[in-house]
Amino acid sequence: MKKIAVLVPCYNEELTIANVIEDFHQHLPEADIYVYDNNSSDKTAQVALEHGAIVVPEYQQGKGNVVRSMFRDIDADCYIMVDGDDTYPAEDAVKVAQLVLDGKAEMAIGDRLSSTYFTENKRPFHNLGNRMVRGLINFIFNSNVKDIMTGCRAFSRRFVKSFPVLSAGFEIETEMTVHALDKNLAIREIPISYRDRMEGSVSKLNTFSDGFKVLITIFRLFREYK
């Protein structure tokens, strides 16, 4: 049986992390669930431990730093990465992972934008930013990736162990896509459901400052890769 690891980068997700873990216990009971806690000031780590996750602290702030540690530390045949905010159903994430398990993709993408994202997401500037990033990446790389910034992906071991993580923050989503496009790695997408954050759960993404970093990252990576 192939080894599957569920990777959940977390920063202050006390309200939602239990739902995420239990959802995967139900739909993918054979998987190991790793919660990397990125200096949370709430009880994210405690709740994750209580629900059976493997909890690892990551002291360098930023999602990119968390992903770097995850990819370095964890050995598996297939890796599923989801945000800890309970916006991605585990049932759909398993379908994304199946594309990797079947050998159809090195990176599989859960495409929110072709599904419920624009009706569920209540942050209009996030919607605009997603469209802008998608258009720019596809123009530069002559590609047709539908959801560049999704927080639900699956990876092969080959992808994970060959990916040089350069970004420290949320730009990591863009970097993963650019890496796959530049190296001509097989990418597959499948539409998935997306649900908005529950009341009281706050997005850590700053639309303007993080959006600016993403744009800078796109041009930096284009220069370095090309």
Per-region residue spans from a language model:
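Cell-envelope/extracellular polymer assembly enzymes that use nucleotide-activated donors
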Residues: K3-A5, D32, E175
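Donor nucleotide-sugar binding loop of glycosyltransferases
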Residues: E13-T16, S40, K63
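Active-site acidic Asp-centered loop
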Residues: N38, V82-G84
